[in-house]
C-alpha cells in the first residue's frame, strides 16, 4: 500500500483538508495542504472550504480550529498529540490572578486549553503578542501560560505582565541555554541567531532576531546562515523554503513529543476511520471564540 496515495484518495472522498504545524515530521509537512505557525493556522481554519479538517498539530490547535468551525468535522490523528505547556494553566490560576488584579485583562497564549480560553479577554500567538498587548488599554495584564513569552512581551511593551502560572513554560524551548548560544557562535561564526520568544530571557538577549516560527520564515531572507533556536523540524521547513541558505538546529534534541505523535499512518487511519473527532462544549466554545476572534481582528 502506498500510504501517500491512500491519504490523497481518502482526502478527496471525505472533502478534507490537512493543516500542519511547522514542527510536524517532514513527511507530514510534505502531504499537508497548508503549513504554518499557530496564528497562520488559526487564520487558515476560518477560510477552509472543506467538510473535514485533519489537524496535524497538538490538541489545543485542533480545538481552536473546531471553535472557529463549529459545523465542520475536525480530526486530531493521535490522542498523544498534546501540549504539556497548555496543560500547565488551570482555570484556578486565572481566577486567583483576577482576584489580585481585578482590572487587568486576561491575555492567553493560544497554547492553552479551550476551557482556559473561555476566561480570556483575548488570545495571542508568539507572532502577535507584542502587537496585541500594546493595543490594550491597560498597564497591567494577566498573561499565560508561558513565562518566557510573558517576559518578552513585558520587555517590548513596558507593561506589567503577570505570568500565570508563575512557572509555565515549553519544555522544548526551556532546554536552550547560554552554552548552546556559545557553541553555535563557535561552530557557525558567520551565522546569525533566530530565537523563539518561548526561550529563556538569557538566550533571548543573545538573539539577532526574536520571532515566532512564521517570523523565522519571513526574516530568513535577511541573512545567508542561521542557527535556529526552536523545535528541530523548523530547520526542515526553512531549508525547503530557502534551499540556497544554511540553517542549523541549535540543539538536535529540541523535539516536541506531542508534535511527533502524528505520523502518515495516523493521518491515513484518521481519514479512514474519521477519528479522533474534536469536540468542544458549546458554552466553552462560544466564550473562547470571542477571545480568538478578537485576536484575529486585532492582529
Swiss-Prot record:
The lineage of its organism: Archaea, Methanobacteriati, Methanobacteriota, Thermococci, Thermococcales. It catalyses: iminosuccinate + dihydroxyacetone phosphate = quinolinate + phosphate + 2 H2O + H(+). Catalyzes the condensation of iminoaspartate with dihydroxyacetone phosphate to form quinolinate. It is found in: Cytoplasm. [4Fe-4S] cluster binds at residues 83, 170, 256. GO terms for molecular function: 4 iron, 4 sulfur cluster binding; metal ion binding; quinolinate synthetase A activity. Pathway: Cofactor biosynthesis; NAD(+) biosynthesis; quinolinate from iminoaspartate: step 1/1. InterPro entries: NadA, NadA_sf, Quinolinate_synth_type2. Belongs to the quinolinate synthase family. Type 2 subfamily. This is Quinolinate synthase. One of its GO terms (biological process) is 'de novo' NAD biosynthetic process from L-aspartate.
Amino acid at each position: 500500500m502506498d500510504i501517500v496515495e491512500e491519504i490523497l484518495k481518502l482526502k478527496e472522498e471525505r472533502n478534507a483538508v490537512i493543516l500542519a504545524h511547522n514542527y510536524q515530521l517532514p513527511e507530514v509537512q510534505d502531504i499537508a495542504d497548508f503549513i504554518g505557525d499557530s496564528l497562520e493556522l488559526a487564520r487558515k481554519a476560518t477560510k477552509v472550504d472543506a467538510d473535514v479538517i485533519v489537524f496535524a498539530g497538538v490538541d489545543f490547535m485542533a480545538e481552536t480550529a473546531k471553535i472557529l468551525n463549529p459545523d465542520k468535522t475536525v480530526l486530531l490523528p493521535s490522542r498523544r498529540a498534546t501540549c504539556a505547556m497548555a496543560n500547565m494553566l488551570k482555570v484556578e490560576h486565572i481566577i486567583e490572578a483576577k482576584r489580585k488584579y481585578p482590572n487587568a485583562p486576561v491575555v492567553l497564549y493560544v497554547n492553552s486549553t479551550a476551557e482556559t480560553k473561555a476566561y480570556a479577554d483575548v488570545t495571542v500567538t508568539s507572532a502577535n503578542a507584542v502587537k496585541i498587548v500594546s493595543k490594550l488599554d491597560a498597564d497591567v495584564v494577566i498573561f499565560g501560560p508561558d513565562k518566557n513569552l510573558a517576559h518578552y512581551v513585558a520587555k517590548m511593551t513596558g507593561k506589567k505582565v503577570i505570568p500565570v502560572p508563575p512557572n509555565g513554560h515549553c519544555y522544548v524551548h526551556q532546554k536552550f541555554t547560554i552554552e548552546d548560544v556559545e557553541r553555535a557562535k563557535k561552530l557557525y561564526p558567520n551565522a546569525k541567531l533566530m530565537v523563539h520568544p518561548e526561550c529563556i530571557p538569557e538566550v533571548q538577549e543573545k538573539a539577532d532576531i526574536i520571532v515566532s516560527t512564521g517570523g523565522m520564515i519571513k526574516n530568513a531572507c535577511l541573512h545567508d546562515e542561521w542557527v535556529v533556536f526552536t523545535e528541530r523540524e523548523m530547520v526542515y521547513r526553512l531549508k525547503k523554503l530557502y534551499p540556497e541558505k544554511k540553517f542549523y538546529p541549535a540543539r538536535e534534541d529540541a523535539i516536541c513529543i506531542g508534535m511527533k505523535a502524528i505520523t502518515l499512518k495516523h493521518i491515513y487511519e484518521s481519514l479512514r476511520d474519521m477519528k479522533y473527532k474534536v469536540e468542544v462544549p458549546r458554552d466553552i466554545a462560544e466564550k473562547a471564540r470571542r477571545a480568538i476572534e478578537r485576536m484575529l481582528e486585532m492582529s
